[in-house]
């Protein structure tokens, strides 16, 4: 979260680092969930705009990286305390971010969109005797799944009202295919599958992005009406059951 403030020692390694260019930094055309990065601008006392100021954008991204490094070091301190207390082998650790963050992608500096950068959040789960420690998975899951996962890992019955599903199968088999994820913000709703993201708007406008081709840079809704209709049905079905 803003502001991006980390102790200086975590920023120093990035001082002369070469930062990769921002992918698809252009403002998207047509009706989208794009916004003017108002939350970021409220903290911007330098009165510079990272959208058209490359040096400032690079500096902001370095400070973001420093915050990630700071968070990593803080987690290390927590793990050290668990080890010193002798309870690390009886503890489930979950690191989870409640949202992602645009660092200039789609000309947005912040969250509050229905694009991948805002909705894809970090999730790390570790527990004693985990089958494949350190193995990443690309499976699509939802934050609803965290609670039933903790219930299963701690041998607690999952309440009937819980809508999520345990992630234990993905922890045991990281290559396992995920399901779908839905989200909404304001008057927009979205569903994400392995290949597509569909975004619908209250005024009827539709966005469809193909992650096997252009990612979320080209709206292909007009070219794939059958896909739009199928995903619209799946989206509404999920939301109606929520």
Predicted region positions:
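Conserved residues at beta->alpha junctions
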Residues: 222
């Amino acid at each position: 979260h803003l502001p991006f403030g980390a102790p200086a020692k975590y920023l120093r390694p990035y001082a002369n680092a070469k930062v990769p260019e921002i992918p698809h930094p252009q403002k998207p055309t047509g009706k989208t969930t794009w916004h003017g990065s108002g939350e970021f601008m409220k903290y911007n006392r330098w009165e510079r705009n990272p959208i058209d100021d490359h040096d400032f954008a690079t500096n902001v991204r370095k400070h973001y990286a420093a915050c990630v490094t700071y968070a990593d070091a803080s987690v290390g301190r927590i793990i050290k305390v668990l080890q010193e207390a002798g309870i690390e082998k009886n503890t489930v650790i979950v690191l989870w971010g409640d949202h992602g963050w645009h660092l200039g992608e789609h000309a947005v500096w912040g969250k509050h969109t229905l694009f991948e950068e805002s909705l894809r959040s970090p999730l790390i789960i570790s527990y004693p005797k985990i089958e494949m420690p350190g193995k990443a998975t690309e499976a699509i899951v939802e934050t609803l799944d965290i609670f039933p996962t903790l219930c299963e890992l701690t041998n607690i019955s999952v309440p009937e009202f819980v809508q999520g599903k345990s992630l234990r199968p993905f922890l045991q088999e990281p290559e396992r295919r995920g399901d779908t994820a839905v989200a909404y913000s304001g008057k927009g709703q979205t569903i994400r599958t392995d290949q597509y993201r569909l975004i619908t708007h209250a005024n009827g406008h539709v966005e469809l992005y193909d992650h096997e081709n252009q990612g979320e840079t080209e709206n292909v809704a007009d070219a794939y009406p059958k896909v739009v209709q199928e995903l619209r049905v799946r989206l509404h079905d999920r939301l109606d059951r929520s």
